[in-house]
Amino acid sequence: MKKLVLCFIVLFLSLNLNAQNLSVFVASSASKAMEEVKNEFLKSHPNDNIDLVFGASGKYYQLLKQGREFDLFFSADTKYAQAIYEDQNTLDKPKVYVLGILALYSLDESLLEGGIEKLKDKANKIHHLSLANPKVAPYGVAAKEVLENLNLDKLFEDKIVLGENISVPVLHVDSNNADLGIVAYSLVSSINHPKGKAILIDQKYFTPLKQSYVITKYAKDKKLAFEFIDFISSQKAKEIFKKYGFDTP
């Protein structure tokens, strides 16, 4: 009996000694999809752990630059992934994993009629329009481009409320703190069971959101990081991303 117990202890310690942990930053736009991707991946790695941290790409780029350790960094664009590469903090060049899509989101379906092109006609009904902060969030930059390209920026400049990342405009709308939001479609697609309704924004109005990742120098000796990246490019992961409303390269 003692030998059996000892065997179990040795096995337990062996499994735990071999267990790997990853710290991964993921832009908020991919938060829900990446949670599912992670869970699917860990089915074949039951002893390992992946900690996902969500937020604005610009904010977490600065934290990484200041010394916060992430093994993988999934940005909402190419800009910050490229910056990490140019800072010589990566093991390889950035790679695109999904293409982001913008949407108008509201609890009031009448504000969505005609799409973004008809927003000017509804300006008097819109008291607050929520966007992600373009200083740190690529989706905020894209939303700003949309407004500028449709000559709506001046019309709405006094009505804009900013969120620190792209999840916040959804919360603003859901809590009636904004009438309308320009958001990541991946957060309000039907699989998310959103409180409001969404309509896609034509991609001709903004620079493509080529969401890219890098493997940082902190993952140098972590086999799990490379295995997870391989899974990201798998058909199964692509199906999950598409399910949430992303395009894939």
Residue ranges and their predicted role:
Residues 50:
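Hydrophobic anchor at the start of a short beta-strand
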Residues 20-44, 53, 58, 65-66, ...:
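Exported/periplasmic ABC-transporter solute-binding proteins
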Residues 4-15:
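Sec-dependent N-terminal signal peptides
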Residues 14-19, 69:
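Intrinsically disordered, low-complexity peptide-like regions
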